[in-house]
Amino acid sequence: MIIIGHPWISSPKFCKVFSAADIKKSKAEDIVLLEPLVDSHTLASHCRQNQISFAVTVNTLQEAIFANALGATYMVCEEDDALIIQPIAQEYLFDTRVLTLIHEEKEITKIARSGIDGVIFPEAIC
């Protein structure tokens, strides 16, 4: 299970960007976070063409399918959406990992039992 943003575990920062200029300002070790996909698909293509790791927030299965097709490293979603997306991601062998946004450590076990790829704490998002 992937755990991002917990103080015990070293993990990259996910930095929100809204333009190609923001992407250029980001650190090489950061994961570029695009949101929402409908407004950032050109930035996703830019990241893919330039081999920049990126994540995208998704709210629907359709957005998740597009995020994977665009080459996102991660997709970030709420638990309810993750429960719908994860089985499809496994069935179609998505390269993109599904992360659920959580606020408390005790939620990790519940997400793990649901078979979701991982969790991300808000502290990991800048």
Task: Give each language-model segment a name.
Residues M1-A69:
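Conserved N-terminal beta1-alpha1 strand-loop-helix module at the mouth
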Residues L61-L70, H103-D117, F121:
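Catalytic cores of alpha/beta
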Residues R48-S53, L70-M75, D95, R113-V119:
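Glycine-enriched alpha-helix->loop->beta-strand junction motifs that scaffold or abut catalytic
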Residues L34-C47, C77-F94, K106, C126:
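Active-site-adjacent beta->alpha loops and helix N-cap segments on the catalytic face
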Residues K25-S26, E91-Y92, A112-R113:
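Solvent-exposed alpha-helices and their adjacent loops that cap or buttress functional pockets
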Residues P36-L37, F54-L61, E79, V98-E107:
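Glycine-rich beta-to-alpha transition loops that act as phosphate-gripper elements at the mouths
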Residues M1-I2, D117, I125:
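Extreme N-terminal leader/targeting regions
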